[in-house]
Amino acid sequence: MENKTIVKTDIQIAQSADIRPIREIADKIAIEEEDLEYYGRHKAKIPLKYIDEEKIKKSKLILVTAINPTPAGEGKTTVSVGLCDGLNKIGKKAVLVLREPSLGPVFGSKGGAAGGGYAQVIPMADINLHFTGDFSAVEKANNLLSALIDNNLQSKKHNLNIDPKTIVWKRVMDMNDRALRQIVIGMGDKNGVVREEGFNITPASEVMAILCLSQDFEDLKQRLGNIFVGYTYDKKPVFARDLKAENAMAILLKDAIKPNLVQTLEGNPAILHGGPFANIAQGTNTIIATKMGLSLGDYVVTEAGFGGDLGAEKFIDIKCRYAGLKPDAYVIVATIRALRYHGGAKKDEYGSPNLEYLKKGFGNLCKHIENAQNYGFQPVVAINHFATDSEEEIKFLKDECAKLGVHAVLADEFMHGGEGMRDLAKIVVEATEQQSDFKFLYPLEESIEAKIEAVAKKIYGAEGVVYSPKAKADLKIIKDLGFDKLPVCIAKTQKSLSDDEKKIGRPTGFDVTVRGFEFAAGAGFVIPILGDIMRMPGLPEVPMAEGMTIDAEGNISGLS
């Protein structure tokens, strides 16, 4: 294996890559050139006609998740990219299927989100910025509904008698901007009804969740029409269909519903589509993109946001349930750095070797392994390799996983791309060939309380669930509206298995508290809210945007 020394930034590596015309990537997965909808030479949209339900049944779906992350993240996307490249290295026809990045985190605290090192999707700058305009389309569709709501409030002929104080629908923008969380609109003469309003970030929009859970265009329209807006003055529910909004919203999404084809640094096909967050929504790419990948490749590598307690749970209990899919392999990304953190290491300590911290933090990984087993999987652990990992620590982690009957394999994609992922790829292929006793955590027929309890006890490790008075009142409304047979999409912190971000490692003896409920009638899930969840993030003290530059030739630096 060639020993590469990383001296370049991610964007420098991406800019120096031998990027191929997208038609060559399409050829690898048998997409006809006349069917490609080009966005320049290196990006294209794929028509939905390439979804093949019979082929889907024969292909293997590999889900990549992670332990609870440190603030820096644990490289789940990087491992996913590397695993796809590794599978292709060992002769498998693998396709990568990921979410699209949000501009908010790109310019905020995270920077780019297209992988890292020698395991990236390209064109990296395009992907991290406007890409093919899908997020803009979601934003416009969301805000069209907002405009129709406010227009109806002052309509004299077609007024639905909506009580402005009950409107739950908010405008969105794909930027971190705390100043827009709570605003007042309609100020001034004849400018509309004055009311309180606010902005969410675009990935938090229900339109994004709907796009990602829709099976086709008709399903998309129906779900858009089912969006709950608020109540009339006589307490009747109002939906987007009552405002005749669904067709116009769908028109704005007519291209956004088509998946985007790009490539990895090694020239393997990557489909990027959709981008809901996993702490406040389902955190996975679109059903359409996943099915497209399974139709075009023999193996699909996909990821679910944050740790297994958030993205993976929602991937399985929401996305797979609606899509009729099930993963064939379950990969948990773990870093020794993060396990030191879960063992009590401080920010200035978890980047240095320390076996004692690792031993104390191993419980977090152990719980995520148990969670995979709750679904009937025997997971594979990918140890995302950092230069600060000691041989002693690596051996400890492999040995402890082996005691649980689980393969733990070093993932060296950051330094070596697909070549550094051959061993992991072989183990994952073996995992896809094993029979799993797959099962959901709960049946839909159960009560909302029983569903929450199933997730809280089986996945988080909680003793029980406590409901605030507001949560009890919200729950009655949900039951009265007939939405209690939907799956639950629990909104909580990604930093802990519990609902308290300070409880790192593997907390025990705790209850989780449901503070309130929201429901996404269009997307098709109920949202129990655990803790304080921010739907419009703010920028950090020193945002990533301040370190970015662009020269006279349009070359960008500082994007990652």
Q: PLM features: what roles do these ranges have?
A:
Residues 2-560:
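Flexible phosphate-sensing "switch/lid" loops adjacent to ATP/NTP-binding sites
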